[in-house]
């Protein structure tokens, strides 16, 4: 910019290292102001260049995500939305977009809603997008196997009833994932103490700052396990009662894509692959990835996110919003998050649509199509080869 100073975002947060230092030279001038000699002086100094910052953002993926998000926000007459795209093996941020947004060349014309970087600063309750982690915890402990079957009829915890959108008398663990069963997920969570589940969520990064370098990033919200009611342990297992940003949620999914290790996220290109923190066993992460493919197959809640030519592991989420301390039935956040190729993930895409008011509100309906186009285009841009035969009607959107 013309001011030579960082105004917002990464440029502002890294201003001290990017700006460099001016040099100084003591000179002798004649009576007309012309320099006639340079003098030795302790005040002389050599100018220093600022440090380079090479961003990991891919302009092609960024443009694709921005266009698809804006179309969805308009079509569903939503309040807002956001998309995050991560490298599934390094944690590098390939795209991060928000809607509404503004022209950074004309910041004075933007209002506060347009200036918010929602994917980093805003907390959401992820809803069913948290279920893969509850399932992972149960599998990792050895308490269950993917073929174990559970009674998934509605049941009570105190005065509250835990139930599913559709009634399923029994489901195995794969079915709990595919059908997005609140009942099944809550029963898996009940196998552990509140402290064990709290520690697990904490290890996933919930309630912990990411130190991404972006100003205003939220830590999310995870209340002390000592304050949990019995029903809260159940609801947290399917994404109510804890909060995190969309970027935090995408980061948590690196546990599944990077063989059980939580990766740091970065807006800068990484010269060396970062070291992750072990959360679950590599074998568990592989099992969960396999289960999540069923979500985008026939009978799954995320069929709208299926990408031709690829096995896609994904999860939908639909959460009612908390207004004045109560969950309301007319305001929702729809989420769709997943990775591909499922066996050896290269990309994580996370989409959230806030308060859709037209043409549906479920995560699979409002966020699924955005996920599909962004994932398909990202894989194509990155040159990832298909993992299964292509149909004859496939089209891929790639910005020029």
Curated annotation (Swiss-Prot):
Keywords: Antibiotic resistance, Carboxypeptidase, Cell cycle, Cell division, Cell inner membrane, Cell membrane, Cell shape, Cell wall biogenesis/degradation, Hydrolase, Membrane, Peptidoglycan synthesis, Protease, Septation, Transmembrane, Transmembrane helix
GO BP term (any one): peptidoglycan biosynthetic process
Cellular compartments per GO CC: plasma membrane
Cell compartment(s), UniProt: Cell inner membrane
Top EC group: hydrolase
GO molecular function, one term: penicillin binding
Disulfides per UniProt: none
Pathway it works in: Cell wall biogenesis; peptidoglycan biosynthesis
EC number(s) reported in the record: 3.4.16.4
One Pfam family cited in the UniProt record for this chain: Transpeptidase
Residue span of region Disordered: 1-21
PANTHER family, A to Z: PEPTIDOGLYCAN D,D-TRANSPEPTIDASE, PEPTIDOGLYCAN D,D-TRANSPEPTIDASE FTSI
Chain's role: Catalyzes cross-linking of the peptidoglycan cell wall at the division septum.
Domain notes: The enzyme has an N-terminal penicillin insensitive transglycosylase domain (formation of linear glycan strands) and a C-terminal penicillin-sensitive transpeptidase domain (cross-linking of the peptide subunits).
Protein name as annotated: Probable peptidoglycan D,D-transpeptidase PenA
């Amino acid at each position: 910019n013309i001011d030579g100073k960082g105004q917002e975002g990464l440029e502002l947060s890294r201003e001290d290292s990017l700006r460099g230092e001016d040099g100084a030279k003591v000179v002798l001038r004649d009576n007309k102001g012309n320099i006639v000699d340079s003098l030795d002086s302790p005040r002389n100094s050599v100018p220093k260049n600022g440090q380079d910052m090479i961003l990991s953002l891919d302009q092609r993926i960024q443009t694709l995500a921005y266009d698809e998000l804006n179309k969805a926000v308009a079509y569903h007459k939503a309040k807002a939305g956001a998309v995050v795209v991560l490298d599934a093996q390094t944690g590098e941020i390939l795209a991060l977009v928000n809607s509404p947004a503004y022209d950074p060349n004309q910041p004075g014309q933007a209002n506060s809603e347009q200036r918010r970087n929602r994917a980093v600063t805003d907390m959401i309750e992820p809803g069913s997008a948290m279920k893969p982690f509850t399932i992972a915890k149960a599998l990792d402990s050895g308490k269950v196997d993917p073929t174990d079957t559970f009674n998934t009829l509605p049941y009570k915890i105190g005065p509250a009833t835990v139930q599913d959108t559709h009634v399923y008398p029994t489901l195995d663990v794969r079915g709990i994932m595919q059908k997005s069963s609140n009942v099944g997920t809550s029963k898996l969570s009940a196998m552990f103490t509140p402290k064990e589940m709290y520690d697990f969520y904490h290890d996933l990064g919930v309630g912990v700052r990411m130190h991404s370098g972006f100003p205003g990033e939220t830590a999310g919200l995870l209340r002390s396990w000592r304050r949990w009611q019995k029903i809260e342990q159940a609801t947290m297992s399917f994404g109510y009662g804890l909060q995190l940003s969309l970027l935090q949620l995408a980061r948590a999914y690196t546990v599944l894509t990077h063989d059980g290790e939580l990766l740091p996220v970065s807006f800068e290109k990484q010269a060396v692959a970062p070291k992750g923190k072990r959360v679950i066993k590599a074998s568990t992460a592989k099992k969960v990835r396999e289960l999540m493919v069923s979500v985008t197959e026939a009978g799954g809640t995320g069929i709208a996110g299926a990408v031709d030519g690829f096995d896609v592991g994904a999860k939908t989420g639909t959460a009612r919003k908390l207004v004045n301390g109560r969950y309301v039935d007319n305001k929702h956040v729809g989420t769709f998050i997943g990775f591909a190729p499922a066996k050896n993930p290269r990309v994580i895409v996370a989409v959230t649509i806030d308060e859709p008011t037209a043409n549906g509100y479920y995560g699979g309906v409002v966020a699924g199509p955005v996920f599909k186009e962004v994932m398909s285009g990202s894989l194509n841009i990155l040159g990832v080869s298909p993992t299964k035969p292509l149909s004859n009607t496939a089209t891929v959107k790639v910005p020029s």
